[in-house]
C-alpha cells in the first residue's frame, strides 16, 4: 500500500502452493502478466516459489528476473531449477584435464550447480556436460537483464542444438 500499487495480490506459501500454481497458470493463459515478489529477499533463494517458477517454465511461459546484486542469483531465480541447495563454482579451469576433473566431481554432488563461462567456451562446456552427465537438467542464462535475455533449458544436448540454431546465442555474456 505504501508503494501505491493497487494490483491484486495473492499469498503463496507451502500450504497453498498447489492451488495457487494452478490459479496463476490460469491467469497466464488468459494473457495476464504476473509478478512474483517476496518480503524475504530475492524470490526462490531459500524462499517459497520454486514449484511456481518450474510450473510456469514447463507450461512454456517466459520468466524474467528483476536483477539484484548478483548475476548468479538473478539467473538462479528464473532458471526453474531447485534453489534449496545450490553451489556456485564460478569459472571452471581452462585446461581440459582440470576442467573434466571438476565436472566429474559435480556428477554425483547433490544440489544445483551454478557455473560461469565465457562466450568462447560455452559450446565446449555443453559438450563436456553432455558427455559426462547426459541426463542432467541444464539452464543456460545469457544476456541477463538485457534486450536479448535468453534462458535455454533442457539437457546439454538440447541446449547445444538450440545454441547451434541461433548465431545470436554465440555472442554476448
Q: What is the meaning of each model-derived region?
A:
Residues 4-7, 26-28, 53-54, 79-84, ...:
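Short, hinge-like loop/turn segments at secondary-structure boundaries
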Residues 38, 65-68, 115, 140:
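General beta-strand structural signal in soluble alpha/beta enzymes
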Residues 6-13, 63-64, 84-90, 135-141:
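Short hydrophobic/aromatic-enriched beta-strand-loop microsegments
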Residues 11-18, 69, 90-95, 143-146:
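Short, acidic/turn-prone active-site loops that include or flank metal/cofactor-
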Residues 51-109:
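Class I SAM-dependent methyltransferase SAM-binding "motif I" and its flanking Rossmann-like core
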Residues 22, 47, 75-77, 99-101, ...:
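Short, well-ordered secondary-structure micro-motifs
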Residues 32-33, 112, 116-173:
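A contiguous loop/helix-start segment that scaffolds small-molecule binding in enzyme catalytic cores
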Residues 1-66, 74:
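Class I S-adenosyl-L-methionine
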Amino acid at each position: 500500500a505504501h508503494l501505491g500499487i493497487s494490483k491484486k495480490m495473492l499469498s503463496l506459501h507451502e500450504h497453498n502452493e498447489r492451488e495457487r500454481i494452478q490459479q496463476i497458470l490460469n491467469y497466464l493463459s488468459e494473457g495476464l502478466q504476473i509478478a512474483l515478489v517476496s518480503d524475504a529477499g530475492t524470490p526462490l533463494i531459500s524462499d517459497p516459489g520454486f514449484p511456481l517458477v518450474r510450473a510456469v517454465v514447463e507450461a512454456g511461459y517466459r520468466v524474467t528476473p528483476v536483477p539484484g546484486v548478483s548475476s548468479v542469483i538473478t539467473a538462479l531465480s528464473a532458471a526453474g531449477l531447485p534453489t534449496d541447495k545450490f553451489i556456485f563454482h564460478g569459472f571452471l579451469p581452462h585446461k581440459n584435464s582440470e576442467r573434466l576433473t571438476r565436472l566429474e566431481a559435480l556428477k554425483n554432488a547433490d544440489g544445483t550447480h551454478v557455473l560461469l563461462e565465457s562466450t568462447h567456451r560455452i559450446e565446449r562446456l555443453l559438450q563436456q556436460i553432455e558427455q559426462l552427465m547426459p541426463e542432467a537438467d541444464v539452464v543456460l542464462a545469457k544476456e541477463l537483464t538485457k534486450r536479448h535475455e535468453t534462458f535455454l533449458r533442457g539437457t546439454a544436448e538440447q541446449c547445444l542444438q538450440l545454441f547451434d540454431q541461433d548465431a545470436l546465442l554465440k555472442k554476448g555474456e
